[in-house]
A protein has these predicted regions:
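Alpha-helical transmembrane segments of multi-pass integral membrane proteins
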Residues: 22, 211, 215, 246-378
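Signature aromatic-anchored transmembrane alpha helix within multi-pass, membrane-resident enzymes
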Residues: 180, 235-253
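Interfacial loop-to-helix junctions that mark the boundaries of transmembrane helices
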Residues: 45, 201, 236-240, 275-278, ...
């Protein structure tokens, strides 16, 4: 079944913002450059930058479920499962496998970053199968890029998503409540049954509520879009009033999110960071949902700020940027790039090293992401499209006489 993928331009800007702040957090971990906007400190925003990963997960769930939500509203059949898996593989696997293998052969092996051959084999095998978050040495201590765990969690979710989404279409309340119950039960065990959370805070079970909120957001969006479509036929006042309200709500939600991030940044140690991250994950999910549901209906200046050719381009390379940036910034320090006077320039607060390192880290990561996207991912996607077209069965011949379909053959709406 062929499906037309819709785009919501404003979400390009939100995706770019989320991934930019996450990468800024990782770069800050290496540079310790205190971010200032004039006299206003952005330190809290960068220190809590890991929270925006939750926003990317919610955005993924929202976009994945949107065709199902539209089908629910229209009374149409669910999207084709084979097409779902093909699109995910086409989008993710070429760039991901290239980056993992490039880091393995170009950095990990030449720099002898593995302590033993069995560990090397285990690390590579688990990364190729997206199972590395299940093991401490391949998740926390891997030399193949610590940021790639997010994609592993997403791929695990993709494997289950069509089944869960069809369940939500049939019994939304029951299935969504089950997702929340499983997630909150697991999280309660983590928070009150454990004293260290590194191996549980970012497992798929701990993100089920974020996925569920994303699905609810998709259902709300199709209703809001239908209402906005009716309002667009009215007078200028009737069109602008909802847009102004959406803009105000967007700004209020963004302010609330910043307040939550400021609170998160006051965590006194790593254990408290992860405990708060789990406890307040639903609150952050609701904040991100507010941004997703208001941005597409806001006034034109805000919509153009978020949805424009620049954000569309950056959104297109964002996955490869995310996958590659953390490995690049760590390897830059191995190479002493840029050169520094002190052995630990980040601890010494060495300038201009901190500024130069930060700018170079952003620039190199962006450049390599563009190269991987346009030299590897897109050509591979075209090859996969041609391969899929060859495997597609030929269309059945049109019969010459009238055919009256039986009940099982009747066309579906």
């Amino acid at each position: 079944m062929s499906e037309r993928r819709e785009r919501i331009p404003e979400l390009d800007g939100l995706r770019v913002l989320m991934i930019f702040i996450v990468s800024w957090y990782h770069i800050w971990q290496q540079s310790w450059l205190r971010p200032m906007l004039g006299s206003y400190s952005l330190d809290y925003l960068v220190r809590s930058g890991y929270v925006w990963v939750d926003g990317t997960v919610l955005l993924s769930s929202f976009l994945l479920f949107l065709p199902y939500a539209q089908a629910m509203r229209d009374g149409a059949p669910p999207p084709d499962t084979r097409s779902f898996y093909f699109r995910r593989a086409r989008r993710i696997l070429p760039g991901y496998y290239f980056i993992i293998l490039a880091v393995f052969f170009g950095i990990a092996l030449p720099w002898k970053l593995y302590s033993s051959a069995p560990y090397m084999v285990k690390d590579l095998a688990t990364h190729l199968t997206f199972t590395f978050p299940f093991f401490y040495d391949t998740y926390i201590a891997t030399p193949l890029g610590a940021a790639s765990w997010t994609l592993a969690i997403e791929v695990q979710a993709y494997a289950l998503f069509p089944l869960v989404a069809r369940g939500v279409m049939k019994r939304p309340a029951a299935v969504l409540c089950l997702l929340f119950a499983v997630c909150f039960g697991f999280r309660a065990w983590c928070v009150w049954g454990l004293t260290e959370y590194s191996m549980v805070v970012n497992q798929l079970l701990n993100f089920l509520d974020v996925y569920a909120v994303g699905m609810l957001a998709a259902m709300a969006f199709v209703r809001l879009r239908a209402h906005a479509g009716k309002a667009s036929a009215g007078s200028l006042r009737k069109r602008l009033l909802p847009q102004a309200l959406a803009t105000v709500l967007f700004l209020l939600v963004f302010w609330a999110l910043l307040r939550m991030l400021r609170f998160q940044a006051t965590s006194k140690d790593y254990v408290e960071i992860q405990r708060r991250q789990m406890i307040f994950r639903p609150v952050f999910a609701l904040c991100f949902t507010g941004l997703v549901l208001t941005a597409p209906f806001a006034l034109l200046p805000l919509r153009k700020l978020l949805g424009n050719p620049v954000t569309r381009f950056l959104g297109g390379i964002s996955m490869n940027y995310y996958l590659i940036h953390q490995t690049i910034i760590v390897h830059m320090k191995r190479l002493h790039l840029p050169p520094s006077v002190s052995d630990e320039p980040h601890m010494a607060g060495e300038q201009p090293w901190q500024t130069h390192y930060t700018l170079l880290a952003f620039g190199l990561s962006l450049l390599l992401a563009i190269l991987v996207t346009y030299a590897v991912e897109k050509p591979a996607a075209r090859l996969l499209d041609r391969w899929a077209k060859k495997r597609r069965p030929p269309a059945a011949a049109v019969p010459s006489g009238p055919v009256f379909p039986g009940p099982e053959e009747a066309p579906r709406p």
